[in-house]
Structure formats: C-alpha cells, structure tokens
Amino acid sequence: VLDAEPASDVVLTVTSSDTGEATVTSTLTFTPANWDTPQTVTITGVDDNIIDGSISSTITVSVNDGSSDNDFDAVADQTVTATTTDDDVAGFTIAESGGSTSVAETGTTDTFTVVLNAQPSSDVVFTISSSDTGEATVTSTLTFTNANWDTPQNVTVTGVDDDIIDGTISSTITVSINDGSSNDSFDAVADQTVTATTTDDDVAGFTIAESG
C-alpha cells in the first residue's frame, strides 16, 4: 500500500530473482482513488525435479518511474525473501520384466531396469552384484547423470553353466549406490535387491562307450 496519495497513478513492478523457484504477480497499479487500499502480491512455488533443498529467492518491489507519479520516482526499492521448500526425494525404482527375473544355465539372459526418482545435481553411480556368480552374473555398474536421470537403464542377468545337478538356484542381485562416486543427496538411499532364478540344464545319467 502507498504511504501517501499520489496526484496520478503509481505503478509498482514486482520481480523474482529466481523464477525457477518462485514466480510473482508482475505489476500493481495504485490510483488517487485506491492508494490506501492494500493490494496482494501472490508468490507461487515452481516445481522442478532437482534435489536442491530449500531455496531462497529475493522478491523486489520497485516503482516504475516511467509510468508513475514523478513524486514517487526517488522511492527506493524494497525486497521480500521467499523460501521454496523442496518436494524431491532421493531414491530409485527397479522394474523387473514380466515381474520376475529368470535365466538358465544355457546362458540365457533376462533384464530389469533401474531409474532415479529425482534429478541429481551430479552423477549417481550404482554398483550391481550377484550373491552367486557361479549361477548368475550381472552388469556391474550403471551411471546416471543430471541429463539422463529419468531414462531407465538395463541390468542384464546372465545364467552361468556348470556340470552339477543342482536344480533351480536362486541368487540375490543387489543394487547399491556407490557413495564415494555419487551425489551426496543419494548417500543414504538404501540398497534394493532382485531375486534371480537359474534353471539347471544338467540331467542325471551315464554313457557307455564300446571299444572297437
């Protein structure tokens, strides 16, 4: 609201220092008739996918000299600090093709995907390991960047042959974030696991070979 009645209109320009975090009503116009009636500036939070915590923006209210009563030209700008609270949480999602992961000792493969739930400010590196590399091996690492964070990447599970009659064997595939090589916001994210089953290709029996 103005502190005194103007002889003509007074136009206030309102700007945000970071429109990626907060936008504002752009102008207010006071006249000799409404100068003492408060007008509202609406500040609106802007969503992004970046894990950036609470961000402060400076809202500046200034007199538009070219469109205002000359008596207000020398009035100094005033500012308000607006804080935008982040709604993005570090995490990742695994999706198994067909809802399960199965391979065979004949060397068949199956895949599941990994994707980040929020955009990091720097790389996030995953380490993938198999609890039994004698039954199933896996893609060893995945790297997500600020640019490809929302594009699912494949982890390939490959069955490993042996000569043992051991039936169907389950292996635990662990997907974990490599803290030392990843964005700090993801350091506390828990590991996730996938169970992979390997079907045996060995059959009990014996072979006779006749000499001559």
Please place each PLM-identified region on the residue numbering.
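Short boundary segments that mark the start of a structured unit
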Residues: 1-212
